[in-house]
Every structure is written in C-alpha cells, then in structure tokens.
C-alpha cells in the first residue's frame, strides 16, 4: 500500500512540469553548450521545474557520453538548484547504463531516467535485473521509462510492483498508456507517476500522476503550467479546454516525430537550435508550413 500524497510523490527529485529537452547543435553538427544553457534557462523561466537532458528527444542515440555529460554540467553550473535535472542514462547494455548513470550522478543530476532495454527484447526477469543493477550502483533516484513502442517489450505491472520495492527506484515515466494498470500501481506502491505522452497528460493527472514529461512543452510550457494549475485548483473545465487547444501540437509531433517537431517548432518561434543528427532529418518546406499553421491553431 502506498504512503503519502500521490499528487506530490517524487516531486522533490523529478519535479511536476518537466520537458524532454532537445540538444542544440551548431551548424557544423557539434554540440552547442551555450545554446543548451540558454534554452534550459528559457524553459525554467516559462514554468518548468525539471528538465530531462539526454533523453530520446535530446537525441541520446546519436550523442556521445562526453557530450551528454558536458551539457549536464553546463546546465547545472549555470542554473544551480533552480531546476531539477533528470539525466537520461539508459541503453540496451546494462554495464554501459551503470557507467553512464554513475557519471551522470557525479556530473550533478538530481535523478536518472532509464529506458527499458530496447532491441534485445529481454524477459521480465531480465528487465527487473537491469533496473535493480542500475539502481544498486547509484545514490540518486531512478525513473523507469516504460515505452514499448520503442523498446518493443513493456514493463509489466507485476515487474513494476517488484521494482517499487527497491529504495532507489522511485518513479515511472509512462508512454504505454494503460491507465487502469497505472492507477493500481499509483494506489498500491510509492512510485511517482509521470505521463510520457502529451495527449494523456490530463488523464494521467486525474489518475493520480505527479506530473508529466512533455515534448510539446518546447513551445507550450506556459500553457502546460496553466493546465496543471487549473487541475490543482479543481477547475477541470479550464484544464480540459487547454488540453484540447494543444491538440494540434500533439498531432504535429505524431506526424513529424518528437525531435523533428521540437527543433522545427523552436525555429519557428525564433530559437534555432540546429538540425537533428542523422538518421533524424529536418522537415520539408511543406511540413514547416503545416507546422506553422499548427502552432497558430494551438495559440502558441
């Protein structure tokens, strides 16, 4: 049985309004640390209380360990304790994940986002041992990232119940969308729950989630904060209205993919953070025109 208030559980380490931040690149393709620091500060000013660095939207598959850690150190140095920093440290290799998790802790991360091992399709016992091995190696909280659309294998509820018993495994970022299973886990464990899929931000809050880790927030952080504030105040009608208003952004993200959407949307808003690294590509001119219409329709 859980203890404490589910709505605030985990917020001290993972925040409540979070963004899976892009990694800015220069024209030559190298990482742009100055732009990364400036962008992080912008999102904090807009209302984020935590940021995920080196997550999927941060192009973790195509950035090296040194780049990831340099960005983490730079943002921590500039922003201090004004924002919770969640470091994406997961991979399909447990030993590499342990190494990256330890390095991220040393670089100043408040917590870790560890994705389910992808491509290799491990068993539930393998998934359990992967996460507990990582958690045993660090002293900061771990968030399990359950995203079967990318990892193929989901983290089953029974496995999450087992993982919840580990003192360092403190949260779940859910991109699976099983609200019924999630509610049961929120009710009967101490895991903090985060929506990892923007269309389900409001439904997950209603189910007892602590918050959300957004992609559309790259251009809609203020609106997401307004949604959260309205929900906390019991004004569900306003929260729902904001959620509906943001649907054009959700559709654009689904159409373009998270990285392409976020970087292109920022460019349209006057923040050029560089092109994605291959195999992710920039949108076509026609796609940019449609995205501009989507931003206008969403009021951002």
UniProtKB/Swiss-Prot annotation:
Site note Part of a proton relay during catalysis, residues: 56, 119
Name of the molecule in the record: 4-hydroxy-tetrahydrodipicolinate synthase
Reaction equation(s) it catalyzes: L-aspartate 4-semialdehyde + pyruvate = (2S,4S)-4-hydroxy-2,3,4,5-tetrahydrodipicolinate + H2O + H(+)
An example molecular function term from Gene Ontology annotations: 4-hydroxy-tetrahydrodipicolinate synthase activity
PROSITE patterns hit by this protein: DHDPS_1, DHDPS_2
Coiled-coil region list: none
Pathway in which the depicted protein is active: Amino-acid biosynthesis; L-lysine biosynthesis via DAP pathway; (S)-tetrahydrodipicolinate from L-aspartate: step 3/4
Subunit-level organization: Homotetramer; dimer of dimers.
Domain of life: Bacteria
Primary subcellular site in the record, as a coarse category: cytoplasm
Broad enzyme group: lyase
Swiss-Prot/TrEMBL keywords: Amino-acid biosynthesis, Cytoplasm, Diaminopimelate biosynthesis, Lyase, Lysine biosynthesis, Schiff base
Gene: dapA
Function of the protein: Catalyzes the condensation of (S)-aspartate-beta-semialdehyde [(S)-ASA] and pyruvate to 4-hydroxy-tetrahydrodipicolinate (HTPA).
UniProt record, GO biological process: diaminopimelate biosynthetic process; lysine biosynthetic process via diaminopimelate
Localization annotation: Cytoplasm
Catalytic residue positions: 145, 173
Family designation: Belongs to the DapA family.
GO cellular component, one term: cytosol
Binding positions (pyruvate): 57, 213
Known EC number: 4.3.3.7
Alphabetized Pfam families for the sequence: DHDPS
């Amino acid at each position: 049985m859980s203890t404490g208030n589910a709505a605030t559980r985990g917020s001290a380490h993972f925040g409540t309004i979070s963004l899976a931040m892009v990694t800015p690149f220069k024209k030559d393709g190298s990482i742009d640390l100055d732009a990364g620091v400036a962008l992080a500060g912008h999102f904090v000013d807009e209302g984020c209380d935590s940021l995920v660095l080196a997550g999927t939207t941060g192009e973790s598959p195509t950035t090296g360990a040194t780049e990831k850690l340099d960005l983490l150190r730079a943002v921590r140095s500039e922003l201090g304790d004004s924002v919770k920093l969640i470091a994406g440290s997961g991979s399909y290799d447990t030993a590499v994940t342990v190494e990256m998790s330890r390095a991220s802790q040393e670089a100043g991360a408040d917590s870790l986002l560890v994705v389910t091992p992808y491509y290799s399709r491990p068993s539930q016992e393998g998934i359990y041992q992967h996460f507990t091995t990582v958690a045993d190696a660090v002293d900061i909280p771990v968030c399990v990232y359950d995203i079967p659309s990318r990892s193929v294998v989901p983290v089953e509820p029974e496995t999450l119940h087992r993982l919840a018993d580990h003192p360092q495994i403190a949260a779940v970022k859910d991109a699976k969308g099983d609200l019924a299973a999630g509610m049961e886990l929120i009710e009967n464990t101490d895991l903090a729950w985060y929506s990892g899929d923007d269309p389900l931000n409001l439904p997950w809050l209603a189910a007892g989630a602590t918050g959300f880790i957004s992609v559309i927030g790259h251009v809609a952080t203020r609106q997401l904060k307004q949604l959260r504030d309205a929900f906390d105040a019991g004004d569900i009608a306003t929260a729902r209205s904001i959620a509906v208003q943001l649907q054009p952004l959700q559709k654009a993200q689904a159409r373009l993919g998270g990285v392409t959407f976020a970087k292109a949307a920022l460019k349209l808003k006057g923040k050029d953070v560089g092109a994605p690294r291959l195999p992710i590509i920039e949108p076509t001119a026609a796609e940019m025109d449609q995205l501009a219409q989507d931003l206008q329709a969403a009021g951002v």
